[in-house]
């Protein structure tokens, strides 16, 4: 779990997301409150519940990107889901309880990976011994083994093909688990029968380099106690878990269309106990959702936040509004962020030995066209930049292998040449941009 201060969290988000200060501050405070709660005495800690957040803003302004970056910062079990994937209990489809099951699955993987790091040195030694045994033979003398150990450390054996016994991870009884049904916490048939077939190994041929990760993971898992991993993961989910529910507006029944879709309000009703605090059965044991932080987001361009069930609105007390992006924001997105599209295209073209230079007026022209098309066609926010950039680089991307060694300057004239006509014709831009 992260111990970053709110200022540090916002600063980290600023590297990838332009603007949206209010939303960044809200998630930063929510994340810091997880840490603050951990410092409290046990009796008071149980009484402090997370303040769930509702992010409202048009498409392409950074709602999903905030969640993606938050997941990396949180160092806590994190899951992002789309509300549209779920149906009311009783209908065909996934029910909302599977959110918690997926969160637990993610936590198990994350916890196991973290614990593997703790036993990495011992696992590396055991994996090394297995490789040497495969290369030199089981009955090799100590002197021979040490010679091969030296070669292994110098990388001289990386391309040597060896035959080793590795765990067979396939579960022949997987077909007994209908989607979502095998995790109901009652009788997981695939799990029961899978254990009967467990412990099997299969002999595989691979190079020494390929065997490294497989053997490291196997040896690390032998040193780990599954029950300890499970207990740590469940504790992390219950105390620090974060669930980001995207497209929450798509399960709103609009006020002028009451009764049009039974499943929509049903999904909201099913979310109520989950967000308020309930116990969900998973194949690893029961999970209490009382202290899981829920962040919901939606564009709300058709439905309104008030179209959500009043009870659900009450369970999302903190509301932040994200503003639409302007042309100036687009310029900053293309030039200031750590993952800017300009940097990505430079790196992609560099693989073909084609140098790319973006001038200030070139970036301004790209931003101007994206903003203009958003105004005249449909405002899809920063996602419009993907389309504009792809059209500008379409010709160059196709011919790049034949232009190796060239230097290309993307200025206003270059953008106009590749995109000007399309941007000026509203009929063309409606379909192409």
UniProtKB/Swiss-Prot annotation:
One MF annotation (Gene Ontology) recorded for this entry: peptidase activity
Cellular component terms per the entry's GO annotation: HslUV protease complex
Chain sites annotated for binding ATP: 18, 60-65, 246, 311, 383
Localization per Swiss-Prot or TrEMBL: Cytoplasm
Keywords: ATP-binding, Chaperone, Cytoplasm, Nucleotide-binding
Listed InterPro entries: AAA+_ATPase (IPR003593), ATP-dep_Clp_protease_ClpX (IPR050052), ATPase_AAA_core (IPR003959), Clp_ATPase_C (IPR019489), HslU (IPR004491), P-loop_NTPase (IPR027417)
Entry's transmembrane regions: none
SUPFAM superfamilies: P-loop containing nucleoside triphosphate hydrolases
Known partners and oligomeric status: A double ring-shaped homohexamer of HslV is capped on each side by a ring-shaped HslU homohexamer. The assembly of the HslU/HslV complex is dependent on binding of ATP.
Family matches, as PANTHER family: ATP-DEPENDENT CLP PROTEASE ATP-BINDING SUBUNIT CLPX-LIKE, MITOCHONDRIAL-RELATED, ATP-DEPENDENT PROTEASE ATPASE SUBUNIT HSLU
Role summary: ATPase subunit of a proteasome-like degradation complex; this subunit has chaperone activity. The binding of ATP and its subsequent hydrolysis by HslU are essential for unfolding of protein substrates subsequently hydrolyzed by HslV. HslU recognizes the N-terminal part of its protein substrates and unfolds these before they are guided to HslV for hydrolysis.
Family designation: Belongs to the ClpX chaperone family. HslU subfamily.
Protein name: ATP-dependent protease ATPase subunit HslU
Organism: Cereibacter sphaeroides (strain KD131 / KCTC 12085) (Rhodobacter sphaeroides)
